[in-house]
Amino acid sequence: MTQDATKCPFHAAAASGGIINKDWWPNQLRLDLLNQHSSKSDPLGAGFDYAEEFKKLDYEGLKRDLRALMTDSQDWWPADFGHYGPQFVRMTWHAAGTYRTGDGRGGAGRGQQRFAPLNSWPDNVNIDKSRRLLWPIKQKYGQKISWADLLVLTGNVALETMGFRTFGFAGGREDTWEPDQDVYWGSEKTWLGGDARYGKGTPGDGTLVAEPAMHGHEKDRVLENPLAAVQMGLIYVNPEGPEGNPDPVAAAHDIRETFARMAMNDEETVALIAGGHTFGKTHGAGTADHVGPEPEAAGLEQQGLGWASSFGSGKAGDAITSGLEVTWTSTPAQWGNEFFENLFKFEWELTKSPAGAHQWQAKNAPATIPDAHDPSKKRVPTMLTTDLSLRFDPAYEKISRRFLENPQAFAEAFARAWFKLTHRDMGPRARYLGPEVPKEELVWQDPIPAVTHDLVDAADVAALKARVLASGLTVQELVGTAWASASTFRGSDKRGGANGARIRLAPQKDWAVNQPEQLARVLQVLEGIQREFNKGADGDKRISLADLIVLAGAAGVEQAARAAGVAVTVPFHPGRADARQDQTDVESFSVLEPSADGFRNYTKARYSVPAEVLLLDKAQLLTLTAPEMTVLVGGLRAININVGGATHGVFTATPGALTNDFFANLLDMSTEWKPAGDLFEGRDRKTGEKRWTGTRVDLVFGSNSVLRSLAEVYASADAKEKFVRDFVAAWAKVMDLDRFDLR
């Protein structure tokens, strides 16, 4: 028997696709999201320390090479106006601009622009050429500079070579080696579709086109959370206007909403748009049907590049990116104030690019704008619909006129907004590396005072634990408060966490999930212990409330373990400080309020997304693995830190003891589970007597095959000590997630 050589062997079929579980069961829980970016995908190995490598970088040499690159035009992709600066600014902007505050995901922090889907988004057409221009420099400096850092630093150097003074630069972004799978970019299945995120709109066909049916309805739409772009594959907004409708006032609504979701106020928004559009041009020499597949769909011979164009030479003056053909100023490779000068000097008439896209042309204006590649040609000034929003939206106009009259204020605002744009997802200043880190502390960096006192030692820790346990606070209160403090951390943008003790400040002290009345009472007791200890401590030794909250949680966990018959010491690393209210932007921190916390069996409202999916999202933001998530849920149910003291999921007769009862009783086949409204009831199969109530978050550990396999480990008769020790390890990890000083 011989195999037909023309048919695909099964190994090759597996490698090239085939039907997978997700195809059969689309709603299957994506536990694989907790296994992203593991050591198996990292070619540098577990011992690689990027911060140490960065210290070895010839930083000034790198910047010299980047400056030289700016005017070293290559025949395979010639520089517009003889300067690559504008296209590198676009590259950097689009790397950082995917960040959104809702869940902290996106942004430049992990070099994700190299991978799908970002490397093939319609809004990123031809940015692949910018990264390829950088390859010789990246190759030269190797692992001393990550792609993630290089993509941002290059934009800074580009601005500097065009006469702009930047606010600074911080390194510290570590590369990942595969696409992020946890970022929800929207549910549309066509490029530039916006129908799902607004509930109406055009499905999109891969080009930026007007949609007459939408005219007059643009202001009515509300963008789906946590998205911060109006269409699938855009960074922010459609430059032609909402759904392609060239209405600058309607476009201002989209601009304000999307930029706000990236933590930008109106002044920062105006500065960023005008500053970015001081440089370079857009490209729309021909129609989109000349443009080939994006990088992820291009042939092997393209070697990771995409959008090969059949229009003329396909490059330089024949380039096609957005389909728009706009140059804003007469000095497109030089910083200046001409964007605002032109914006207000001229009246504007609607026209179309050679590709048929809506854009605006100055009326009766002289041809003062240079051609990007032909010195003998001049053009009249042009603008995008979204540029005109800065003049015709009343709030934006006020800011724009101030910048027109005060160029220095504009330059300062752009420098600060650009730094915020490119560093917003890096977390606290403790992560910043390099010689150009600004000295000024900015409130959006969530600053925390430096620790200037001596830290507690082992004897102090033991004494403080004893005081905490003798204070009258329950194990549930101690563990619950520590969890509430630490579990705000987001691995996406490195915000939140226990350091700073912001749980005692607005807005966190008032969040319903934190049970404000109970929290205030617990904090009052802990503050009393802190004052008493600090007053009697030797020398300059002190303990911060941030440290004491975590230490009290450790004491609670140890007490719960003792109640289960296991002696354990929870790791504790002092060194946290207490932030002040003036260091805490209430609006900025409000996005950290959990809509759900499955670890506390809490949901703020009824959501269309199942509670177990929200648990998974929370676990992913906490950088937990599936086993860590599993053991934490089981342990926290056994202790019972449920919001409001609810007993859902508390499958034990001894709440407060760190037992494996949650798993043992969930998997007990003598219990039959049935839905009961939004909950589930577990009843004795023989008598019908109600034993337990549980939520979707609880029951998923017996329902999902992967989670059940983990639950079985902890439900086993020999798992008593393993369960406790695994819980303690996962607990300690969460408590220290924001301790970048320990890494």
Swiss-Prot record:
Top enzyme class: oxidoreductase
Post-translational modification: Formation of the three residue Trp-Tyr-Met cross-link is important for the catalase, but not the peroxidase activity of the enzyme.
GO molecular function, one term: catalase activity
Key words of the record: Heme, Hydrogen peroxide, Iron, Metal-binding, Oxidoreductase, Peroxidase
Cross-link (Tryptophyl-tyrosyl-methioninium (Tyr-Met) (with W-93)): 236-262
UniProt catalytic activity: H2O2 + AH2 = A + 2 H2O; 2 H2O2 = O2 + 2 H2O
InterPro entries: Catalase_peroxidase, Haem_peroxidase, Haem_peroxidase_sf, Peroxidases_AS, Peroxidases_heam-ligand_BS
Keyword Disulfide bond: no
Cofactor note: Binds 1 heme b (iron(II)-protoporphyrin IX) group per dimer.
HAMAP family: Catal_peroxid
NCBIfam families assigned to the protein according to its UniProt record, in alphabetical order: cat_per_HPI (TIGR00198), PRK15061.1 (NF011635)
The protein's name in its UniProt record: Catalase-peroxidase
Species assigned in the record: Paracidovorax citrulli (strain AAC00-1)
Classification of source organism: Bacteria, Pseudomonadati, Pseudomonadota, Betaproteobacteria, Burkholderiales
Gene behind this protein: katG
